[in-house]
């Protein structure tokens, strides 16, 4: 009977019937086994996992895909919220700040908020209000810092004066004196130069001739020839590079008498105070000499205050009179004679 029924059906119905039977068989064979244990209804388990990790999908099994996505894992990672941090940073800044940095940070924060979209604005409305409050306080702090910076720049700079270098002043004075002398002498010696030029033109050539008679007499004696040349070189080298003519670059040679004369005549020192410079066993360096001269100048420049017992704020007026000892003795003797 079954066979008759199947053959009595139209060919289209037969095809649909066979497909339905095959689907039932495939549904029965679809099973999942984990650790050799079969799991019933795996579709329900998958739905429950999606509800746990992505509750907004509810019963749908659609995976959200964002732009510029490279893998499926990125759809399950929660989106990072970029909070603006310039409000917190302004609380830890110093009083003096540069206004340009604040403007750049505000521009960057505005662009980042615009690119994030409407969902970011709806989720973080409270954060926007907090950031606007922080921004207003930040602008007020920047205005105060700009005002303090302008006041500091407008105030006159403090000038620190270093101690005077007397030796350097003496050397400069000496150079100026030499330059003035050379300029005055150059103007007066114009005619002398013309005369010297004429003399040089009329001069004959001068040459030194060395006598090598003892060496020429025996041309095979090379030892004496070499010794003679070596001795001449030694003498020339010794004259140029003798210890007397050698002066280090850091050393300065001073004429003590000329230096004392400069200090007395030009700077107003007392010659009696400068006697220590004439000592033969003076082991002072240039720095120590300048210290002593500064001490003498300060002692001379500070006015001497003599107290005569004037009125003070916390004391009664007093009058101090200095009387010599013999006058005191005479006054005491006269008082005894008059009273006795």
Swiss-Prot record:
Compositional bias of kind Low complexity: 99-115, 182-191
Source organism per UniProt: Candida albicans (strain SC5314 / ATCC MYA-2876) (Yeast)
Prosegment location in residue numbers: 315-340
Sugar-bearing residue positions: 127, 270
Subcellular location: Cell membrane; Secreted
Protein known as: Predicted GPI-anchored protein 46
Keyword Cell division: no
GO cellular component: extracellular region; plasma membrane; side of membrane
Feature: compositional bias, Basic and acidic residues: 192-202
UniProt keyword terms in alphabetical order: Cell membrane, Glycoprotein, GPI-anchor, Lipoprotein, Membrane, Secreted, Signal
